[in-house]
Each structure stands twice: as structure tokens, then as C-alpha cells.
A protein has these predicted regions:
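Flexible loop/hinge segments at secondary-structure junctions
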Residues: 7-17, 21-354
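Short, Lys/Arg-rich N-terminal segment immediately upstream of the first membrane anchor
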Residues: 1-4
Length: 354
């Protein structure tokens, strides 16, 4: 009788285990795994503030996480060439022969580059492309130069030397900035745009008037921190860095003759006039006469491998970045929501992954 009770007890335990297993198997599958997937990325510092702002929301929605180490667009392109990370960002297209055949471009992040300055004036400065080009090319060296004064009537401009700060690393932000200078003021910025400021500089940085006055720093955080600690300085970077560094931001004259602030609406208006190619590249139209276009709007391209082992998670991340709730998660950062033909292109590119 004792053996029979033990046998019955064992059978009951077995039945309980089988029932529990069946109930677990019958549950509908979830889009989230217990641990999720941790994606890794690097590259453009332009992308960092948006990615930071969207990280928690993406995790809550997908169960996945990501880490992004920045390093600059050049570092992102190099990492992509070596097959490092799940995604890498570059603010200019990766057209070099080193790009792997399975890597595609997804222009997923849009925002303005701000021309930022540390100057003791109360009114926001207004600057045209030709004036900005003259400042960064070293032909305008004083804040009260007639070119600046003519655009800022009523502003008490000091007779101080302008200290120019540029990106010393390979930078897509620099590439876009110098493309803008060459595109809108080619007589002054005579060289084509370049990701390397030194090689794209239309003159010599070692002349007596430029040496020590035009200096470099690495990364967006580096140039804005240096500018923030240097009175009478000027630099260029993503808008999100201006406030932290205590910098003012100029309104820039567009091709229609209007001075436009670097905001999301102005960026969207400018990007809407760009030519979008099937390979994911944008060609900006600096001559667009859209009234509120901000002519220093740019995109950052996600460089992704279509054969990624984490294809599903990667697609979900890029889709989340393009969702309006991501660029508007912190409106003060100035990122623009991608819409229209560019959004359609992005969705097509994302569909190629996996």
C-alpha cells in the first residue's frame, strides 16, 4: 500500500508538470524577450542627443537596448568598414571604396547645425553665408567688421578679435558645414566641402593672422566646450550643445533673403527641397527659395548591414527613431521629424535589412 501511494504521488507530480508546460506553450508569444537584444553603435556625435533622448522609450516599447559610443562620423565609417557594431552613423554619405557591399544608408536623423558664438551682445546675430565663410576662412577677423555690422544694425559689436574653433576630427558635421559654405559662398570658400576642416580650408591656417586664432577641438562637445570658455569665439555644432556651453546661436540668411532661426520647422523646409536618390543619399539645394528654409539643415545616415544577425531588432530601432515620438521626445534639442519622400525612402531602405 505504501508503494502504491508513492506511485500515485509521482504520477500526480508528473501530470502537474505536463499541465504547466502546456499552459506556458499556449500563451501568445511576446514581442519582448526576457533579456532583449543589446545593439551597439558608434559614429556621428550629431546623433548622440537624439539617441540618448529616445533610449528609454525604445527599451519600453521593444524590450531591446542599445549603446552608442559616438566618436565622430569618420569613426563610424571606419567601424562600419570593419564590421564593428550593429549600426554606425555618419553625417555624410559613405562613398569610399572601403564600404562593404552589404552596407546601406538610412538617413534617419535630421536637425540643424548651429553657428554658435560667445559674444557680449544682447541681440541675436544675423549672418549670411558669405559673412560666415569670411569668418571661418580668416578674411573677417574682427567682430565689428563692416560685413557683420551691415547685417546687424543697432547691435553694439565689440572691436574684438574673432576666435574661430573648428572640428579637428574627421566630422560629417564639418563636411556639411563646408558644403554649405562652398555651396552658398563659393567665391570665398573656394574649396569643395570636406569632412576634414584643415584640408578643406581655402588658405593657410599657419599665416600670422590665423595661427593660434583659428584652432581645433575634437567632437561637438569639444568645440562647444572650448567656445564656451573662450570669449569672442565662434564655432559650429548641433543645437543641443549650445545651451550647455552657454553659447548664442545666429540666424542664417537663406536664398530667399530671410534670416531663419535653426529650428525643426526650418530644417524640415530645407530638407524638403533636397533631391533624394534611391541609394539613400541626399543632395541639398542651397538655392531653395522656400521662405522659412534653414540652409544648414542636415541628416545623419545610419550605416547598416543588410545581413545583420540582429536584423529584427535593428529594423525596430530605426523604425522607432523615425517615429515622430523620438525626434520630439525633447523639443529643445531641435531635431526634425522626417516626412514625405524621405520617410518613404527610409522605410524602403529598412525593408532591405534581413
Amino acid at each position: 500500500m505504501k508503494m502504491t501511494k508513492k506511485w500515485i504521488f509521482a504520477v500526480l507530480i508528473l501530470i502537474a508538470v505536463l499541465v504547466a508546460a502546456l499552459l506556458f506553450a499556449a500563451k501568445p508569444s511576446s514581442t519582448k524577450s526576457a533579456a532583449g537584444i543589446n545593439l551597439t553603435g558608434s559614429g556621428s556625435t550629431f546623433a548622440i542627443p537624439l539617441l540618448d533622448a529616445c533610449k528609454a522609450g525604445y527599451n519600453a516599447e521593444s524590450g531591446n537596448t542599445f549603446t552608442y559610443s559616438g566618436g565622430g562620423s569618420g569613426a563610424g565609417r571606419s567601424a562600419s568598414d570593419q564590421g564593428i557594431n550593429d549600426f554606425n552613423f555618419s553625417d555624410t554619405p559613405h562613398t569610399a571604396s572601403t564600404r562593404r557591399a552589404t552596407v546601406i544608408h538610412v538617413p534617419a536623423i535630421a536637425a540643424p547645425i548651429g553657428v554658435m558664438y560667445k559674444l557680449d551682445v544682447t541681440q541675436p546675430l544675423k549672418l549670411s553665408a558669405s559673412t560666415i565663410a569670411g569668418i571661418f576662412a580668416g578674411t573677417i577677423t574682427k567682430w565689428n567688421d563692416s560685413a557683420i555690422a551691415s547685417e546687424n544694425a543697432g547691435v553694439n559689436l565689440p572691436a574684438k578679435t574673432i576666435h574661430v574653433i573648428y572640428r579637428s576630427d574627421s566630422s560629417g558635421t564639418t563636411g556639411n558645414f563646408t558644403n554649405f559654405l562652398h555651396g552658398m559662398a563659393p567665391a570665398i570658400w573656394t574649396k569643395p566641402g570636406s569632412n576634414d576642416f584643415k584640408s578643406g580650408f581655402p588658405g593657410s591656417l599657419n599665416t600670422a593672422s590665423n595661427l593660434g586664432r583659428i584652432v581645433g577641438a575634437a567632437g561637438s562637445s569639444g568645440v562647444t566646450a572650448l567656445a564656451g570658455g573662450t570669449p569672442d569665439s565662434i564655432t559650429y555644432a548641433e543645437m543641443s550643445y549650445a545651451k550647455a556651453a552657454g553659447l548664442s546661436v545666429a540666424d542664417i540668411k537663406n536664398a530667399s533673403g530671410n534670416y531663419q532661426a535653426p529650428d525643426a520647422a526650418g530644417t524640415s523646409a530645407f530638407l524638403g527641397a533636397a533631391t533624394v536618390s534611391s541609394n539613400g543619399y541626399l543632395t541639398f539645394n542651397y538655392a531653395t527659395t522656400v521662405a522659412n528654409a534653414y540652409p544648414l539643415g542636415i541628416v545623419s545616415y545610419a550605416l547598416v548591414d543588410t545581413t545583420s544577425k540582429n536584423a529584427a531588432a535593428l529594423k525596430s530601432l530605426l523604425t522607432y527613431i523615425l517615429d515622430p515620438k523620438c525626434p520630439t521626445a525633447d523639443p529643445s534639442l531641435g531635431y526634425a521629424t522626417i516626412t514625405g519622400p524621405l520617410l518613404t525612402l527610409d522605410q524602403t531602405q529598412i525593408g532591405k535589412i534581413g
